[in-house]
Amino acid sequence: MKYKDIYTEAPANPDTLSMLGPIAPLAGKWFGDDGVDTHPQAGGPETEPYVETWDFEVMDPQNNGPQVLYGLRYHVHITKPGELAAFHDQVGYLLYEPETHKIYMTLAIPRGQIAMAEGTAMPGDREIRLHAERGQMVNGICSNPFLEEAFLTKSWNVVFKFHEDGRFSYEQVTKLEIPGVKGEFEHTDANTMRMIEAPRPNPAMIEEGLLNRCPKA
């Protein structure tokens, strides 16, 4: 990344949706009821079905001085079939930097854990791979003391795949170090999602459109 100084903000396109590159297909609200989750239990691995929604909200461009990021604010809500109470809730941002084609996915869950996965993809790619690893300064993982002791997260990998029919699927593998369990335990999640609500434009784009239709005298 080339820049004259670290303070001067680069110009940003208010139309975030047109600048999202490879993550653009994710914008909108999605539903999936084919989820399969394999997680650790005292008696060994347990596999259960789940139902979920992913809500990717188009947000305004973000400047770090000369760096410009375009992204989606997301919320994941997961329940077991036939239940209302969530057994997994997740929020974060999915960010794309057009200049470097880098993608950053942040994660925060109410179990007391945060992470940021990183990857690279080009506009039009049918697959996105992201990786986070404990101890890394950029794509790292940070957990509360209990999780560090009992379910140490070593790495988090997520793959998004975009299908011709407009759906997307994902696979996640979270590698854990658990006392009494030999080797690393692979906690896996996978589902296929279909859109239930189209994306809405970001506030800056709405404002830009209003100004164009009603220019100031």
Protein language model annotation of sequence segments:
Residues 166-176:
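Internal, hydrophobic beta-strand segments that form the core of beta-sheet-rich folds
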Residues 98-148:
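An exposed acidic His-Trp-rich patch
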Residues 21-22, 146-164:
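Exposed beta-sheet edge/beta-hairpin loop segments within beta-rich domains
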Residues 80-87, 112-117, 137-141, 178-183:
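Short, surface-exposed beta-strand/loop "edge" segments at domain boundaries and coil↔beta transitions
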Residues 70-114:
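Aromatic- and glycine-enriched beta-alpha-beta binding-site module
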Residues 64-65, 96-101, 119-129, 160-168, ...:
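A short, structured loop/turn motif at beta-sheet edges
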Residues 1-71, 77-81, 152-155, 175-217:
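Amphipathic/hydrophobic helical signal segments and adjacent flexible N-terminal regions
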Residues 53-55, 93, 118, 157-159:
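Short, surface-exposed charged micro-motifs
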